[in-house]
Amino acid sequence: MLDRCDRVQIAVHDAAKAAQRFGQLLGSIVARRDHSRHLGARRTILAVGESEFELCEADGAGLTQDFLARRGEGLMTAGYCTADLDSMVKRWEGLGVAYDRDAEQLYLSPETTFGLPIVISESTYRPRVGPVSFLYETTNTLATNWRRVAAVYAGLFGLDPARFSEIGSERFGYVGTLTLFDPPNRLDRIELSQVTDDVHAMGRFVKTHGDSLYMCYVEVHDWAAVRGRLLEANARYTPRGSDPATDPDGGWVHPKELHGLLLGISRTGLAWDWSGREELVPSV
């Protein structure tokens, strides 16, 4: 029932300042502004490729203010979309799952989804903006057994476990799976990463926050342009290879550069390399 990764919601102190920074590094533009009752926030919504990043400023007491007080600026909510919100509601009500409907968005609390605050929006076509193509992954870091989480998500969202692709990394210290929604047509998924130690950054994060939302990933159709933006701004990022000035594939932008958001970036199709379909990776 989930079509794709649709958006993220980011808690910020100053949305105008954050919007300028995201535009500088990612070529995003402001699409609109509104208010969220559920989040207790004024939202500045950025068009980032085909996806949207919601910059959320606290508007009095509520979830956004609580997040900022507890964690500071950063990634607050993972967003996905479905073609039929009402069918999703019926599914959850049949399972006895609590949710909140705020205008045309459905929210699940992190207590329901293993530390992963989730918002579901209705699927809609949006023209691509800038050098980013789309958001395709949000990472649910886990102390809980990933197999249990995968089974729960399959039930909650009507996902097919036969499409999932197991993952693991000694470099980053985790095991888990990618809950791919529609392979091989699209990369969209929730990454379930159960940490294997508390030495690596991901493990340290889970030691502090428990089951949680860690980061997100975008695909770019013009990595050279994004890389150039990062270098021109002297923004801290870790390339997939050894040379930040010439790396052909992508990398990770440090949270301090994007108001607390740890952002992974990969060139077109590269992520199939670790998503169970290496044959789909285009050559550079």
Annotate each PLM feature:
Residues 4-13, 44-49, 54, 64-144, 173-194, 224-284, ...:
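Vicinal oxygen chelate
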Residues 33-35, 58, 64-69, 101-105, ...:
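Short, tandemly repeated low-complexity microdomains enriched for cysteine and small residues
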Residues 30-48, 107-112, 166-180:
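N-terminal strand-loop-strand beta-hairpin
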Residues 14-29, 88-95, 144-161, 226-234:
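Amphipathic alpha-helical segments
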Residues 1-62, 99:
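An N-terminus-focused feature that recognizes amino-terminal "leader" regions
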Residues 1-19, 75-80, 121-157, 162, ...:
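N-terminal beta-strand motif that seeds the catalytic metal site of vicinal oxygen chelate
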Residues 146-197:
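Aromatic-anchored, glycine/proline-accented short structural segments
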